[in-house]
Amino acid sequence: SNLCGHATLAAAHVIFEHLDFPEATIHFATRFVGPLTVTRSGDWLTLDFPAWQSEPAEPPALLLETLGITEYKEVRVARDYMVVMENQQQVEAVRPNIHAMIPLGKMVCITAPGDGEYDFVSRFFCPGEAVAEDPVTGSTHSMLIPYWAAKLNKTQMLARQVSERGGDLRCQLTGTRVYIGGQAVTYLTGKVLLR
């Protein structure tokens, strides 16, 4: 993929936490998606990513088969497939065969309106990758935020990725950009000795 939220967030976290970066915003120049910025506010880091519009799609039989579902509200496509479901319980209940998704040639996101404080929830499956279900996915929110902003008629939302580990994302749509807020923690520090 040409856009990776994990790497952007991790790089920003290291710059802010370990390199004593004095500003509140970091500007990254990227090869494929142009400039990306990350802004720090307390414990939260906000990524400024391009907004991706999705198109309605006729779901391939394999998509529904590998998700183990027959019912869905709609299927859309951008970089990834997006399968919209009725509610959060349906999203949590999916037990996909992720390896069998490889012939689809795309990653697969499932989403639905959220319960309680959450505007929407999602899960993200990565066929053929080392991590079969991504715990939290910044880049797929480039597609989810414009979709839910239009559906819910609001530009600021709280989302939850309901993977096993899970994570909250503060979401905002501003024109052709999305702002995705998340939290990062340092779990490992080490030294590399160059000889």
Range-by-range predicted roles:
Residues 1-195:
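Active-site proximal loop and beta-alpha junction motif in alpha/beta enzyme cores
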